[in-house]
Amino acid sequence: MKKTLLEIVQEILNDMDSDEVGSITDTMESSQASEIVKSTYFAMLSNRNWPHTKKPIQLIASGTPDRPTHMTLPEGVKELSVLNYNKAKGGETRKHYKSVRYLDPDAFLRRQNYLNNDNDNIDVIVDVTGVELLIKNDKAPEYFTSFDDTVLVFDSYDSTTDSTLQNSKVQASAYIYPTWSHLDDFVPDLPAEAFTSFIEEAKAKCSFKLRQVVDQKAEQEAGRQGRWLSRKARRIAGGIKY
C-alpha cells in the first residue's frame, strides 16, 4: 500500500519509540527522518530502471543551420531507451519511423571521418567544443553519439526536407527521474509493491543515523523485499522465469 511522506515518517518514529508528530516539520527528529526518507527514495530509484518511470520524451532541436544534426535531452532524463526518426521524404504522406542507433564517440568519429568533404553531400559543421564534424546532408540519420551525455549529435540530415533535424519527427522514450515534493501529503512515486522495501530501508537508515542503533529486523526485511523486487523486475524484462 502506498503511503504519504508524513505516514512514512510517523511509522519510522513509532518504531523508534519517538514522539508522535502531526507534520514532518514538528520536531528536529521528524525533519531529519523525512530527509533520510528522501535520500533513501532517490537511492532506490538509481539502482535500477523502474518500468513506471519510462516515459515518451521530446528532444530539443538545435534550431540553427550551424549545427543541423544536434539535439538536446530534456531535464530529468536518467537513461535514453528508444530513439526513432521519421525518415519520410518530402512529399510523402506515410510516416517512416526507423531506429537510430547509438555509437560511442570514438566509433562515431571514425565512421564520419571516412566521408569526403569535397563532395556536395557532405557538410563540415563545428561543434560547440570547436571540433569539426563531417556530416551527410542528403539522408535522414542512421547513427548518433554524445560527447557530454546531454547533447546528441547525429550523422546526417536531409537538407531537401528540413534545414535541421526536427523534434516533431522524433519518437523517443527514456527513464525519467520523478520529482520530489517535501510535503506531508506527498506520495513517493514508486509501485505499491515497492513501498515495504522502501520503508524498511528508510527505517534501518534512520535507526542507525539518528540513534546509532542497527535495526536488524528492518535491515533483514529491506534485504528480503529488495531481492523479491529484483526478481520481479527481471521477470518482466524476460530474465528469470518461474
Residue ranges and their predicted role:
Residues 1-242:
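Glycine-enriched, solvent-exposed interface loops adjoining structured elements
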